[in-house]
A protein has these predicted regions:
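Extended, well-ordered protein cores
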Residues: 1-214
Length: 215
């Protein structure tokens, strides 16, 4: 739980400028709520795993692919968070949280998994953008509410509708989606490179600065 809360605050600190920009604030908030939130998504992930084989009976194929990508992302995130939590708890409670997180990150390692995690985040953003440009898909999503609820896929339905509306609004401004996704990719990649390659004191200093911006 501490790891998730730290990561949520870190995301807010990394994107305070985007949260102040009315054009991209909804998309930034959507990423925070759905992908970087400290909330427990185990029920939604279990739902996806349980009904993965029946998704195609309710949703169009492109949507099925996105749902499975989301499930893979959250499963990998849980795995990495668990590894970091073990390393976090192994440290004295008096350790400053920024330094504690940096040590946990370096201890957990798995750079390839981290890169894949970010690649899935980007893929979801591009998928949702593509959906908004598919004629009739928004209406189709709306008509699928009851079937989705009946099939136990209400959480997925919510994610898709929220994502569709959020990115649909963003596509109305030329280049806004691409700019938003590029910014997230660049900042998250820069942070990963820092945490994997830099000395501990540099990692702790940057993380503490970022957390300060979230306040």
């Amino acid at each position: 739980r501490d790891i998730k809360q730290f990561q949520s605050r870190r995301f807010m600190g990394s994107y305070t400028d985007l949260m102040r920009d009315p054009t991209v604030r909804p998309a930034t908030q959507f990423f925070l709520d759905e992908l970087y939130s400290p909330g427990d998504y185990s029920a939604r992930d279990a739902q996806f795993a349980r009904i993965a084989g029946t998704l195609q009976t309710v949703f169009p194929r492109p949507v099925v692919h996105t749902a499975l990508t989301l499930a893979l992302l959250h499963a990998k995130t849980e795995e990495l968070d668990h590894a970091m939590a073990q390393a976090w708890l192994a440290q004295p409670e008096t350790t400053p949280e920024a330094g504690r997180y940096a040590v946990a990150w370096k201890t957990a390692g798995q750079p390839e998994a981290r890169r894949q995690q970010l690649a899935w985040v980007m893929e979801l953003g591009h998928d949702l953008t593509r959906f908004t440009r598919t004629p009739g898909l928004r209406l189709l999503l709306r008509t699928m509410r009851r079937p989705a609820q009946a099939a136990g896929m209400g959480a997925l339905q919510h994610f898709l509708e929220m994502g569709f509306d959020t990115f649909g609004a963003l596509t109305k401004k030329r280049g806004a989606v691409e700019g938003f996704l590029d910014t997230v990719r660049e900042r998250e990649t820069r942070l990963m490179d820092l945490l994997f390659d830099a000395e501990l004191v540099a990692c702790e200093t940057q993380l503490a600065r970022t957390l300060g911006q979230a306040r």
